[in-house]
A protein has these predicted regions:
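CBM-like, beta-strand-rich accessory domains located in the C-terminal region of large
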Residues: 12-350
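Zn2+-dependent peptidoglycan hydrolase active-site motif and core
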Residues: 9
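Structural recognition of the beta-strand scaffold that forms the well-ordered cores
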Residues: 2-6, 29-31
Length: 350
């Protein structure tokens, strides 16, 4: 079931093809000042392509980066959408920079019955159900009295043709009232086990000096997610080092997951997005001479690593004990363990 869907298609001669189905409005994208990709591109294409990068699949943790800057380059100098899937939640992070100041809006096409409840959009189709929860730059206005929430996202219901052209269906647009030229959008898509599930992840919005993030409580685990505000290209000639809750890093984004009641330093599951180091006090948890994308897990005495980002990768990872085995991108590698650090070298993407 496509619980969040694209609008579909229709036969070419129908005006709805070129006026709607071929356009950005028919997809789950961000519009700027009401516009998406240039409509001229349906006739001439785009010389600048979009790309998918750095796919990591570590079972309950997955990541991929979608770079749509090229096709949007008439309006955007930066149009990145990160997908980070941890357990039952997909975090969608939009990193957007435009040439001019204006209004951003997020489009959502439900593949089922949609209902706004407070700050959430609930979508249900049979036994499938998700919650779409915008968290940054603002929450969704809690009630229909949007004038009581002048800074929060307000929603618009838009009617559009169905794929069979026999009627219309509704999609949603979430508008940011502020006029800006740079924004971080973070939306949580919560995958419900059943439509009636009540015990959903509890999410705290958190921020500090030069970072924003979340703390997620769910099923006895805590996940801390951090987004580095200095690592988005705004400082071309300066480092992007931040300190967040005792973690010191230059990573664009990172997450640590640990059991409730434990200290974050005891985490056995880390995600690092475009970073060269992660330290806490005098202890190095990850280090490399080049910025990498990494998922690290310690399970049953084994260290598992998923790595991408460079043609050849060398890095060190903290481990309190010498692991029984080290598996990198699905392959068993020799265990090189020195002074609490597992060293891997010569990793290439095949």
């Amino acid at each position: 079931v496509d619980i969040i869907k694209d609008a579909g298609n229709c036969w070419y001669p129908n005006p709805s093809y070129r006026n709607y189905f071929f356009q950005s409005e028919a997809h789950n994208v961000v519009l700027f000042n009401g516009k998406g990709q240039s409509r001229e591109q349906q006739y001439h294409g785009s010389m600048l392509r979009g790309y998918l990068h750095y796919l990591l699949d570590a079972d309950n943790v997955k990541y991929v980066l979608a770079n749509g800057t090229g096709p949007y380059s008439d309006q955007f100098s930066r149009n990145f959408r990160h997908f980070l899937w941890i357990d039952d939640v997909i975090y969608m992070i939009d990193d957007l920079k435009t040439h001019d100041v204006g209004h951003f809006e997020w489009l959502w096409h439900p593949g089922g019955e949609a209902e706004k409840r407070g700050i959430d959009l609930n979508i249900t189709n049979g036994n499938s159900s998700v919650v779409v929860r915008p968290l940054y730059p603002r929450l969704l206005a809690k009630s229909d009295f949007v004038h009581d929430y002048p800074e929060d996202l307000y929603w618009e219901e838009v009617e559009a043709p169905t794929e069979d052209l026999k009627g219309t269906e509704t999609y949603y647009s979430f508008h940011l009232p502020a006029k800006v030229d740079r924004v971080k959008g973070l939306t949580a898509i919560i995958l419900k086990e059943t439509p009636d599930q009540k015990d959903l992840p509890y999410m705290e919005r958190r921020e500090g000096k030069d970072w924003i993030g979340l703390r997620i409580h769910y099923k006895g685990k805590i996940t801390d997610l951090y987004i580095n505000q200095l690592a988005d290209g705004r400082l071309m000639h300066s480092n992007s080092w931040i300190e967040a809750d005792g973690w010191f890093t230059d990573a664009y984004m990172f997450a640590v997951t640990y059991e409730a009641g434990m200290e974050p330093a005891g985490s056995k599951e880390h995600f690092i997005c475009y970073g060269s180091a992660l330290r806490r006090g005098d202890v190095s948890f990850f280090s490399s001479l080049a910025k990498l994308f990494v998922i690290q897990k310690e399970e049953n005495g084994r260290m598992k690593l998923w790595m991408d980002g460079q043609p050849k990768m060398n890095a060190g990872f903290r481990s309190e004990k010498r692991p029984k085995a080290v598996v990198v991108n699905g392959k068993v590698t020799p265990v090189v363990y020195e002074k609490g650090t597992v060293k891997v070298s010569g990793v290439v993407i095949e």
